[in-house]
Amino acid sequence: AFYFSTSCGRTADAGVWGTDPQKYPYLQPVEVKPGRQSLDLGDNDDFDSFIRSRDVTAYDSSYAMFRWETDISSDMVSAQINGAGTVTDMTVTGRGAGGIASELSVSGSDGTVTVKGQGAIRSALGNPALVIKKQDGKTMEGSATLPSAFISIEKRTGEDGKPSFHIYGGGFGHGVGMSQNGAQGMAKEGKD
């Protein structure tokens, strides 16, 4: 069985680990709410609207990590991603089932680097110095990885005039299988 802490309102499939999802037909990307519909969130515009919305409901939408945000400077990204040089831009260029980021393009003074896989993306953008602001207003620090790869990235200009990146995120974990907080939310509603 596969499980994770908190969803973003959607789940992913086994493709997040580079595995053929057809080998695991029971791991389907679905909504974490009644009806469990499968929505296509593979387009950045559709996913950006979804992850930035505070109106999405799910069995675990009341949990703090259902939605979160953080800021990462170009200096921090430059130090963590080899080969790009001084980072000037970052874009999600591939999305897997449920909208999870599967490919990230990082452009800089020395060229463009592609980061592939949700785990690699979470590690490349995570840093213990990051302050993750949870939807309940509380913060979390000290994690070497992003909480999840269900992310949308908005380029901004930092106080130093350099590019910075605001990350809108949702959920905590890889997003495959059962959301533990989703299951708890179902139990609170009297569902089996």
What are these regions (language model features)?
Residues A1-D192:
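Conserved, single-site charged/polar hotspot
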